[in-house]
């Protein structure tokens, strides 16, 4: 489904919280949304790697990488695995790499930027805890919507308004 965040903001002003503008769109899906699954990790993408192996239909992984720009939390292999397992998208408060392949992958991907270095794999990270960045708290089970206009969060699923 295609989401237009300005239209969602207009239709549901009391429900949505808008994330501060900071993300770039990298995936082949420029618009995506779904139920939030959270990962909190810092320069270690072990939990991200575990999660992309899980079924992700109707879900968006939101990764709090602490805003680090010293290593990439997502690369082409993990992005392709996430797409194959049905994830709608991944939003990373951190960096990604392999952007030329990710741009061709059927997945929504937003991140702060790119970095060619991979992370260490120390097995450190938290799954499905509340995380906060960009002035918004992301709660597992709530919903996130993203497009080229920005990222918004809602405690319940939103439908695109009908054109008048």
From Swiss-Prot:
One GO term under biological process is:
regulation of RNA metabolic process
Enumerate the cofactors the protein uses.
Answer: a divalent metal cation
- Pfam families, sorted: RraA-like
Residue positions binding substrate: 75-78, 97
SUPFAM superfamilies tied to this protein: RraA-like
Q: What is its EC number?
A: 4.1.3.17, 4.1.1.112
Major enzyme class? lyase
* Signal peptide feature range: none
Q: Which residues bind a divalent metal cation?
A: 98
Q: Name one GO molecular function term.
A: oxaloacetate decarboxylase activity
Which UniProt key words apply to this protein? Lyase, Metal-binding
What does the record note about the cofactor? Divalent metal cation.
Reactions this protein catalyses: 4-hydroxy-4-methyl-2-oxoglutarate = 2 pyruvate; oxaloacetate + H(+) = pyruvate + CO2
Taxonomy, superkingdom:
Bacteria
Could you tell me which NCBIfam families the record lists for this protein?
NOT-MenG (TIGR01935), PRK09372.1 (NF006875), PRK12487.1 (NF009134)
Q: How does it assemble?
A: Homotrimer.
The family note in this entry says: Belongs to the class II aldolase/RraA-like family.
Q: What does this protein do?
A: Catalyzes the aldol cleavage of 4-hydroxy-4-methyl-2-oxoglutarate (HMG) into 2 molecules of pyruvate. Also contains a secondary oxaloacetate (OAA) decarboxylase activity due to the common pyruvate enolate transition state formed following C-C bond cleavage in the retro-aldol and decarboxylation reactions.
Q: Which PANTHER family match?
A: 4-HYDROXY-4-METHYL-2-OXOGLUTARATE ALDOLASE 3-RELATED, REGULATOR OF RIBONUCLEASE ACTIVITY A
Q: What is this protein called?
A: Putative 4-hydroxy-4-methyl-2-oxoglutarate aldolase
Q: Which organism is it from?
A: Hahella chejuensis (strain KCTC 2396)
């Amino acid at each position: 489904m295609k989401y237009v965040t300005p239209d969602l903001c207009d239709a549901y002003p009391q429900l949505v919280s808008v994330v501060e503008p900071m993300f770039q769109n990298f995936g082949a899906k420029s618009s995506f949304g779904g139920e939030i699954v959270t990962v909190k990790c810092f320069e270690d993408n072990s939990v991200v790697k575990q999660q992309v192996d899980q079924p992700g239909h109707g879900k968006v992984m939101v990764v709090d990488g602490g805003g680090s720009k010293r290593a990439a939390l997502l690369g082409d292999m993990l992005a392709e695995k996430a797409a194959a397992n049905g994830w709608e998208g991944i939003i990373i408060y951190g960096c990604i790499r392999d952007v030329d392949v990710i741009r061709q992958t059927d997945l929504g991907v937003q991140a702060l930027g790119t970095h060619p270095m991979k992370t260490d794999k120390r097995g450190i990270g938290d799954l499905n805890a509340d995380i906060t960045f960009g002035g918004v708290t992301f709660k597992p089970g709530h919903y996130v919507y993203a497009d080229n206009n920005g990222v918004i969060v809602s405690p319940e699923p939103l439908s695109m308004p009908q054109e008048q």
